[in-house]
Amino acid sequence: MTNVSGVDFQLRSVPLLSRVGADRADRLRTDMEAAAAGWPGAALLRVDSRNRVLVANGRVLLGAAIELADKPPPEAVFLGRVEGGRHVWAVRAALQPIADPDIPAEAVDLRGLGRIMDDTSSQLVSSASALLNWHDNARFSALDGAPTKPARAGWSRVNPITGHEEFPRIDPAVICLVHDGADRAVLARQAAWPERMFSLLAGFVEAGESFEVCVAREIREEIGLTVRDVRYLGSQQWPFPRSLMVGFHALGDPDEEFSFSDGEIAEAAWFTRDEVRAALAAGDWSSASESKLLLPGSISIARVIIESWAACE
């Protein structure tokens, strides 16, 4: 276990969706001739309308781009290069059955992948999901409502008449573990969640806010606590549909009463480190555990933050 002070700790591991995998090769986005030159030998990631991909043996299954078309179609997005320099593109399309019956392929989305996916696969799938979700909802300009077309190998959209260019946007959100500097931390259950399902407090950053100010405001709004010593831990992209989760921890007072004024949180409680460790050992939200406390799955930064705090001595 990590021997750290009671008021500070760091993440013990990098969240799955934050790890460096494929080379994003961003310089090729503005050189379509070079990007297209790699198409005949490129790999293709199909993402269906439910944001699912085919996975087998811990890796995403990639097809041959040339089987889709003889050149990149306008709706394809360039994800980068994998080992050996092979280009990878993604499209929104139905998943194709695997011809080999010995390959145990299954259709899963990012939420269901957890620890079964390697770093490169997780980066490819998360980038593809984020980009394709954006294209699905950005066919008209936010500036004037005019139709737009994909550009930069799928990394922007352009008004073909005016030349106005728009890029994928993200919505920054904070997620925070509130603890007492000793042996207890706050976990909360949203009103929409089943009984026993708890996680960290989170919320979107408002205009004019820093991340730290957002942490203090969100926790005050959601459970009525005043926090201090807000400290950064790490970040993770979360393409559901386009969030960037920025993780923190902060000190709170267990003697301060909870209040749930905005209706988003149904209940919150202080849990001891031993209670949290037991819940982590029992599994996660998807398990059949009878534990009184069910925690987020391994793909989320929430899980990594909770695990890191629980490992403190």
Swiss-Prot record:
It is an enzyme of class 3 (hydrolase). It catalyses: a 5'-end NAD(+)-phospho-ribonucleoside in mRNA + H2O = a 5'-end phospho-adenosine-phospho-ribonucleoside in mRNA + beta-nicotinamide D-ribonucleotide + 2 H(+); NAD(+) + H2O = beta-nicotinamide D-ribonucleotide + AMP + 2 H(+); NADH + H2O = reduced beta-nicotinamide D-ribonucleotide + AMP + 2 H(+). Its cofactor is Mg(2+); Mn(2+). It comes from the Bacteria. Belongs to the Nudix hydrolase family. NudC subfamily. Homodimer. This is NAD-capped RNA hydrolase NudC. It comes from Mycobacterium tuberculosis (strain ATCC 25177 / H37Ra). The gene is nudC.
